[in-house]
């Protein structure tokens, strides 16, 4: 039995880190979960249980509003106002997540009572309603993620640079688990859908999505996936979706309603940051996927 290999596709807010730091942080979290699953003595006696890991640092490639590569701030941030197109996309996505009653309430609220900076009234009203579900005021993370997902999907030249960079991390002769977190799950799914990775006969055998926004219908529409069409994996790839219902980026739900052959697993990442990649990586479902071929 061979040691498992993982390619991680990271998510948002990684512009100021590095590939080396990402690998260090992911390894630490993965090892914690694997040790919790198998026991410290077993892990010490069989080092093959600790997978090898590669993480292409794609976010270093993107600079906002430019068709160029560079290490500068890459996606829209809290200091930049929403464009009209961003506003429309975020409103569409949040309307997907809100109930009809919540959408009606949003139209009645006074947006001046919520101090969210640089947000237009249409977004602020919906944020106020969504905030009632999540009293810890984490709706800002959802808005940030939606901006970055849209930026990736609506700038094909930049997206192709990201895809080219990520694809280089894969080998057709190394058994591989792909772990995509947040926007990284969208990037990885795009690559699988286009058969740039995980095509028949290649070594990718498992796809793990963590904190994925793929369950939000507006995201799928932006990926040019028609409403009735279900997300899907090639027959030879096992798909595991790990989500925390308190993670707003997931829409507080799994993917089973919008995807075929996916296994949803609910986890509890705690209250500090349910969307944090380290919290997902140290869960037992991810540890099982990371060591499946050895069990």
Which residue stretches match the model-derived regions?
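N-terminal accessory alpha/beta regions
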Residues: 44-103
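Lipid deacylating catalytic domains
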Residues: 1-59, 63-70, 111-179, 185-295
């Amino acid at each position: 039995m061979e040691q498992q290999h993982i390619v991680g596709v990271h998510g948002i807010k990684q512009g100021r880190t590095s590939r080396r730091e990402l690998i260090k942080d992911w390894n630490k979290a993965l090892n914690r979960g694997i040790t919790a699953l198998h026991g410290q003595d077993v892990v010490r006696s069989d080092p093959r249980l600790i997978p090898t890991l590669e993480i292409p640092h794609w976010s270093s490639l993107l600079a906002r509003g430019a068709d160029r590569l560079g290490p500068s701030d890459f996606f829209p941030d809290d200091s930049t106002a929403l464009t009209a197109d961003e506003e429309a996309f975020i409103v569409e996505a949040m309307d997907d997540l809100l109930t009809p009653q919540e959408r009606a309430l949003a139209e009645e609220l006074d947006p001046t009572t919520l101090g969210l900076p640089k947000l237009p009234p249409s977004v602020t009203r919906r944020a106020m309603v969504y905030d009632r579900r999540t009293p810890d005021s984490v709706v800002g993370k959802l808005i940030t993620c939606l901006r970055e997902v849209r930026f990736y999907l609506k700038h094909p030249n930049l997206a192709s640079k990201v895809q080219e960079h990520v694809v280089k991390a894969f080998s057709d002769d190394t058994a591989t688990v792909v772990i995509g977190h947040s926007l990284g799950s969208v990037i990885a799914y795009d690559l699988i859908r286009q058969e740039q990775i995980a095509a028949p006969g290649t070594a990718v055998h498992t796809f793990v999505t963590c904190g994925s926004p793929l369950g939000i219908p507006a995201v799928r529409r932006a990926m040019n996936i028609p409403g009735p069409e279900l997300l899907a994996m090639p027959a030879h790839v096992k798909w595991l979706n790990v989500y925390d219902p308190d993670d707003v980026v997931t829409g507080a739900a799994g993917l089973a309603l919008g995807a075929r052959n996916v296994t949803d697993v609910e986890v509890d990442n705690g209250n500090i940051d349910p969307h944090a990649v380290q919290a997902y990586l140290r869960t037992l479902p991810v540890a099982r996927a990371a060591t499946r071929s050895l069990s």
